[in-house]
Amino acid sequence: MHTVSLTHQLVAIQDDFDLDKIIESGQCFRPQKLSDGRYRFLSGDALLYLTPLGDGQYDAAWYGSDRDYWADYFDLGRNYAALRCSLAGQSSYLDKSLDFGQGIRILHQDPWEMLITFLISQRKSIPAIRTAVEHLARCCGEPLSAEGDEVFLFPTPQQLCGLSEAQLMGCGLGYRTRYIQNAAAQASSGTLDLGALAALPDDALFSRLLELDGVGKKVANCVCLFGYGRTAMAPIDVWIQRLIDEEFGGRDPFPSYDQQAGIVQQYLFYYKRSTSRSVAHKK
């Protein structure tokens, strides 16, 4: 296991920024709140620990990256408080979602990790996705030790290609194993260049992702939004479809939000899933 040194820096974030809500918002599956109060984030070969100090102050400690990398990751160039204000008053349900989800931000994550993660996510609950992704990382990801904490980086395409079908199945991937194998083989050979796809416009990016084995509209939209920062893309899963039927009379509301559609979707998703689970727990 490779022991790494962290760079510490005091950072101030005055905009909407709630780490618990971000972690539970369904867009990321490896970030975690640790028992010592730190929040750990992994992205590609980069590692970050955030310790809240109060009044928007955080002790940030990172490896394999810099401050600008994480500012982009957390979309700190966008004013979410102002965005919520601009969206308010359009529907009572959206207003409740905006208030409830204050602190959520769209994370700009690693496209490779997003592709594999959301391939795994199909027909799985969020806890099950987290478990499968963590098993995959522990199976072949690079192990690191940082200030007493041991982590595993997300596997590269080459590392995944080195796993047998039985090893992948052992990570709880089930029928998704074939999808993971095909994506890893294409990315490893260069047939699939996820970095180059960043230059494509939204429609072309979406279409290219749909060509991959196992990628449907929901997975493609998730990769576009959370891997490439395409905020006009709004993934529609079971929760969102239920919300569209119950709150919007079956009419898809997202096209009217244009470049903010994906952000609106995230507020609605978080509110719908959180409140539905809360009601279920009370029964």
Task: Identify the function of each model-found stretch.
Residues 1-283:
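HhH-family (HhH-GPD) DNA N-glycosylase catalytic core used in base-excision repair
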